[in-house]
Structure formats: C-alpha cells, structure tokens
UniProtKB/Swiss-Prot annotation:
InterPro entries with a match to the protein in the record: APPBP2 (IPR042476), TPR-like_helical_dom_sf (IPR011990), TPR_rpt (IPR019734)
One GO process term, biological-process aspect: proteasome-mediated ubiquitin-dependent protein catabolic process
Protein name, UniProt field: Amyloid protein-binding protein 2
Chain positions of TPR repeats: 50-83, 120-153, 206-239, 288-321, 333-367, 429-462, 471-505, 514-547
Activation/inhibition comment: E3 ubiquitin-protein ligase activity of the CRL2(APPBP2) complex is inhibited by APP.
Gene expressing this chain: APPBP2
Organism of derivation: Homo sapiens (Human)
Superkingdom field: Eukaryota
Amino acid sequence: MAAVELEWIPETLYNTAISAVVDNYIRSRRDIRSLPENIQFDVYYKLYQQGRLCQLGSEFCELEVFAKVLRALDKRHLLHHCFQALMDHGVKVASVLAYSFSRRCSYIAESDAAVKEKAIQVGFVLGGFLSDAGWYSDAEKVFLSCLQLCTLHDEMLHWFRAVECCVRLLHVRNGNCKYHLGEETFKLAQTYMDKLSKHGQQANKAALYGELCALLFAKSHYDEAYKWCIEAMKEITAGLPVKVVVDVLRQASKACVVKREFKKAEQLIKHAVYLARDHFGSKHPKYSDTLLDYGFYLLNVDNICQSVAIYQAALDIRQSVFGGKNIHVATAHEDLAYSSYVHQYSSGKFDNALFHAERAIGIITHILPEDHLLLASSKRVKALILEEIAIDCHNKETEQRLLQEAHDLHLSSLQLAKKAFGEFNVQTAKHYGNLGRLYQSMRKFKEAEEMHIKAIQIKEQLLGQEDYEVALSVGHLASLYNYDMNQYENAEKLYLRSIAIGKKLFGEGYSGLEYDYRGLIKLYNSIGNYEKVFEYHNVLSNWNRLRDRQYSVTDALEDVSTSPQSTEEVVQSFLISQNVEGPSC
C-alpha cells in the first residue's frame, strides 16, 4: 500500500517529528508559525514539556501567535497548563497580551468597520480565555478595548457586539469583585438593548440577567438577585449556548438556596451539574463550577459530609486544569476549607480545613493586591478555624497567640467587607457575628454581646426574623448569655427561637440543633430544672438517631449522573412555580 493512502499517522512518528522541530527550534522558529494551529500548538506544548518556558513565553507574548494558538479549540485544557506555567514562572503573558491588544485597537480606530469587527472577534476569544483562566484584570482590559471599538460605529451590528461585550465585562468584574463598576456595565448593556428594541431587534438577555444575578448575590441583595434570576430563566430558549444555560441554572439555584427554597434549588443545580458533565466532560472547568455550587447547596441543606466530597472533586478538577497559583484553585481551596471546618466542628480535627484555608490565602496574596475583597472570606475562614484550635489548646501562651491571630484576621476581613459593601450588609453582619464569638473565646463578654446584637439587628432587617443567618447569631448570643454571663432567662428565649427557626427550615434532624439542645441541658442544670434536663436529653437522643439515618447512603455525584427531565422541563417547572410562563425551549 502506498504511503499516500494511509488514513492516519502513527502517534510515535508524529511525536518524533514534533520533537525534531523543537530540537531545531531556533532555526525553525519562523517556519513553525506557518504550520496549522493544531500542529503549531503541539510544538509549543513540547517546549512546555521540556521546561523551555523562556522560549515558550517569547512565543505566547506575541499577539498574532497566541491568537492563532487559541483557534486550536480541542487543546484548550493543555493550553491552560502552559499558560499557568508561564505565569508561575514570572512571565507576565496575560498582561503583555492585554496591553498588545489594547494598543492594536487604538491603532485601528480609523480603519474600516471590517477591520474593527475582526479585532473584536479576536478580543472576545482572547478575553474569554483570560477570563476562563482567572486573569480578570487583563480580561477586563481586553473587553474594554473591544467596547471602545464598538462605540466607534453607531450601527446595529455593533450594538449587538456591545451587548455581548458588556456581558463579558460584567462577568470579569464580578469575578474580580469590582461590583460598583458592574452596575455601570449592566446599565450600559441596557442602553444598547433599548436601541436594538427601538429598531425591532432583540438580543437574548439570559446571560446578561444571569450576570446581574451574580452581582446582586455577591452584594447580598438576595431578593433582587432572585427576581433577576426569574427574568434570566424566562430568557432560556432553544439554541442558547449550553454554557449560558448552565450558568443561569447555577445562579438561579444559589438564589433559591438563600431564599430557602431548597426543592427548587436542588432541581436547578442537579440539572446544571448533569448538563455541564454531559456537554463539557468531567474534567472541564465549567463542570467544576457547577460542582462548587452543588457543594454550596449541599452545605446549606445540612448534607455536610457530601458537600465536602463535592468540593474536593471540584478542587481536583481545577488543580488538574490550572494548577499553580490560580484564582480558581484558590476559591476551591477556600470552599473546601469552610465545609471541612463545619464537617469537623464537633470532632475538633481541623488540620485539613486549616491546610486549605492557608493555601487559599497564599495563592490570593501572591496574585492579587493585599486589600482585595477575595481575601476577606479566606481570612474569615482561617480565623474561624484558628479560634477552634485555640479553644482546644492546653498551652495558654499558644492559645492567646492563636486567638490574637484570629482577631487580626477577623478585623481585616471586617474592614474589607465594610469598604466594599458598607455597614448595612449581610456580609458585614457575618463578620460582626464572628467577632462576637471570638470575643467570647477571649473572655471579652461585653464586646461579644455588642457584636452579636449588631449582627442580629442587621440580619433581621435585611433577611427577616426567621432566616437561617438570624438563627445562627441568635444561637451564638444565647451561648454567650448561658455559658459566660449567667443570663439564663434571656438565653432560654434565644435558644428556643434558634431551635424553632432551624426546625422550620431544615427539619428535626438539622445539625445545628445539637448545640442549642446541649446549651439548654446546661442551662436547665444550672437553674436546677431537672425535669427539663431529662426532657432535652431525650430530645438530643432522638436527634442523634435521626442524624444516623440522614444522608447515610446517598452519593451526591451518583445522584446527578442522569437527569429525569429535559432542560425545557426544568425551566418550565421553575417558571410555573413562580406563576410565570417562559418561552419555549
């Protein structure tokens, strides 16, 4: 058989050819750039495998070269490996590319519309990659340059492009915690939407509304976030990119969780997980995004053990894709740290939780400014863990050192939250509550009481009298009154209120009830009401039996391996529950 008739190339022969090209890289550098994008990428990947990062960096820092490499779509997973290795090596390839693109856009400002359109398309792909890789500031620079090009032509095509650009810009600003700029971006997108509408044109609003929901959720404006999620769900139609559908389902699920509509949240997030795995595969970053939100749901419905497993799975994917000092890896470490802390709270074994909290902080401080808002939540988690370790410590000097470190972390988190959100915000209230618990551990009881009351007042005004967050703070204040201030009457009222909220939201087997029940047993012992002591010992025994039966078998990942409903059915089911009709998928 003649060689020309072969329908495939033996892998070893191909790899040998790639290696030969790489061995002669200096001489063949220019010729490499004329190769098809897939082969060109394979040459660059071989440079990466051989540790020749300086040469790889010099290639990737050229916009034309990198734009061509981005066209090798089936190599994206490997491209993330190379890119992250360069960033870890100190090659600022993300900022170099963003700067190069920005300069190119300024050069072509006077060129015709076709040249600008081509540049916008390159910008969307480049900015999309930088966004996916977590380099939000550089992605923002790229999208701002695209938006500038869009504004130079007041015609319909560029209005559509401007809307798309605003959606992408809003996403990276949300990711980078630039919430004040996010609001401006949404308003600008609406302006272009209105222009299109006046000319009888409609752009799909699902992605835009989904990003607005993410913005409002991050700012703890939960009622508004929920409202806009409904609007986003109405916009899900046939032909919409799967990525957009998955992201809208994720945001809607989170909004349902904080509204304590757990059945709706479960249906939405399970379908999002199924859809992401089915479409993107089980090693894709988008699948890990859905797992993090699935973990959030499980944690909030008190299925803590399974949430830890899901968060670990998400972290594993992100480490395999990005590795190194990457923001996506840091957020996965933080989520796993907090769920591990909650999971091991009663056992006191916090080594794993502390490891992940410190990894998150280490990565964030390496790649972001020291006053970045993302540090607030990571520092908060580490402070919670250190406080528990300190309480169990038998060495007084070590205990005081750990408590002081926790105090410094909590204060830093509080200042970052107040700067970003102001005083009257759920996130700020959480930090007050955490400080209240810490002051109790430090035996500063008046300061502790003040912090808890402040947290309760803010949460009640924002979330209502019967929210989970309110119950947490009420229970913490009850503990302070019971164990340290001998205010038993006040403590009893608060415990009973916390229990009532917990049972109403989560049922009789809710894990948080244990601490309230034990608190009441101690309280009734202190005042000599032994009938009540006996009663709550029985209640606690029944609670333990319920816990043993709860979540004993279910594998959360196995639970989402199939979907009993289509996307259209999931969307319609959600909208019908809101008494809203959506467009047909």
